[in-house]
């Protein structure tokens, strides 16, 4: 049966530059050019052109990404969907994952290590009962190394995929390591067709697993002082974030410039007769939520004044761990402490203190917290 077939050809051009000393040495610069050619007839594959070098009489043939002669032929798909595997194999492939085997990246993406896929394949088909066959050599396109693979189990075609890995020549990762990483990437993609780890793409399972086995924590960049929320395993033994990120206690209210916690007193406006007590209170920083209350006044003119201690009957206290009002939509569901810890939180408070004329209580709270932070610096 004749059909239209497209091929992806890779032209490798070699620029031969003679050395000034005429020692016949030359430098080769390899440039990959991808041309997608579509057949306009029923004769099958187009003929592959050869790249010519204007600087030299030597020529090199064009390499094809999928250069296996059987890549587009039916023989490649031997035994495809012929019959299902035995029940014993199916039970092994579709078994529930061990929650302890699942890992999570700082951005919240959960995954199963590649070695786990290999172990499941070995348990289902036995060592030697499956293989990942490459079709074509590894090719570097831009800053990515790619290579196509097909997965065979018990002599039957199962799935195919293109593995990829970021790679820059003369970088910290070698060509061999990048090729092996691309192979592992292709294996994981092929295993999806066998149902291995299919729950990792199920949104319901992802939410349930995160709620039980992962936690989100504040981390700080030790160089830029930027703060972000990263995901960790709940049962982790230590912080695994790479430098310059480190886990930070978001309970500490940062200053306006350095976002570091201030050790100034919460009760620094108390009576002068209790100086000794005030000195001991000043050592208690703002990372003690049960002692943090910010008092503010609200009058008809909507001009609140921040106080650190309870002074008058018409004042109200703000707990730094209270949830912010829902009108502050950007931080809805978060606490005042989390708002202040955010790098953009202070500017947001400044905006809120000058807005919300129709909600004087929110305006008063934002102003009170701003004044409290300024006094704590």
UniProtKB/Swiss-Prot annotation:
InterPro entries: Mgm101. Keywords: DNA damage, DNA repair, DNA-binding, Mitochondrion, Mitochondrion nucleoid, Transit peptide. It is found in: Mitochondrion matrix, Mitochondrion nucleoid. Residues 311-320 have a biased composition (Acidic residues). Residues 254-320 are annotated as: Disordered. Residues 1-12 form a transit peptide. GO terms for cellular component: mitochondrial chromosome; mitochondrial nucleoid; mitochondrion. Residues 255-287 have a biased composition (Low complexity). GO terms for molecular function: DNA binding; single-stranded DNA binding. Coiled coil: none annotated. The keyword DNA-binding applies. Pfam families: Mgm101p (PF06420). The keyword DNA repair applies. It comes from the Eukaryota. One of its GO terms (biological process) is mitochondrial genome maintenance. Performs an essential function in the repair of oxidatively damaged mtDNA that is required for the maintenance of the mitochondrial genome. Binds to DNA. Belongs to the MGM101 family. This is Mitochondrial genome maintenance protein mgm101 homolog. The gene is mgm101.
């Amino acid at each position: 049966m004749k059909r239209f077939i497209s091929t992806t050809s890779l032209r490798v051009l070699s620029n031969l530059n003679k050395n000034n000393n005429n020692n016949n040495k030359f430098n080769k610069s390899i440039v990959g050019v991808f041309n997608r050619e579509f057949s306009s007839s029923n004769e099958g594959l187009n003929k592959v052109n050869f790249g010519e070098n204007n600087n030299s009489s030597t020529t090199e043939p064009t390499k094809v990404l999928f250069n296996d002669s059987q890549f587009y032929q039916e023989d490649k798909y031997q035994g495809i969907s012929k019959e299902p595997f035995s029940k014993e194999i199916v039970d092994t492939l579709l078994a529930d994952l061990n929650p302890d085997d699942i890992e999570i990246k700082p951005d919240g993406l959960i995954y199963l290590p590649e070695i786990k896929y290999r172990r499941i394949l070995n348990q289902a088909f036995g060592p030697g009962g499956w293989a990942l066959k490459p079709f074509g050599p590894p090719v570097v396109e831009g800053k990515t190394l790619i290579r196509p693979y097909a997965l065979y189990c018990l002599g039957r075609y199962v799935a195919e995929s293109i593995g990829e890995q970021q790679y820059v020549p003369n970088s910290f990762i070698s060509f061999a390591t990048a090729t092996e990483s691309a192979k592992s990437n292709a294996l994981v993609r092929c295993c999806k067709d066998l149902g291995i780890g299919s729950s990792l793409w199920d949104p319901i399972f992802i939410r349930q697993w995160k709620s039980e086995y992962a936690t989100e924590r504040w981390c700080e960049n030790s160089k830029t002082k930027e703060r972000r929320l990263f995901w960790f395993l709940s049962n982790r033994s230590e912080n695994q974030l790479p430098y310059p990120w480190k886990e930070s206690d978001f309970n500490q209210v940062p200053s306006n410039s350095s976002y570091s916690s201030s050790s100034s007193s919460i009760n620094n406006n108390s009576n002068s007769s209790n100086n000794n007590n005030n000195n001991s209170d000043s050592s208690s920083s703002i990372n003690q939520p049960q002692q943090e209350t910010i008092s503010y006044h609200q009058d008809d003119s909507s001009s609140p004044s921040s106080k650190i201690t309870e002074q008058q009957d018409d004042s109200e206290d703000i707990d730094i761990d209270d949830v912010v009002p829902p009108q502050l939509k950007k931080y809805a569901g978060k606490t005042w402490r989390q708002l202040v810890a955010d790098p953009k939180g202070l500017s947001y408070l400044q905006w809120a203190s000058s807005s919300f004329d129709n909600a004087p209580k929110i305006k008063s709270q934002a102003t009170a917290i701003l004044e409290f932070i300024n006094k704590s610096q």
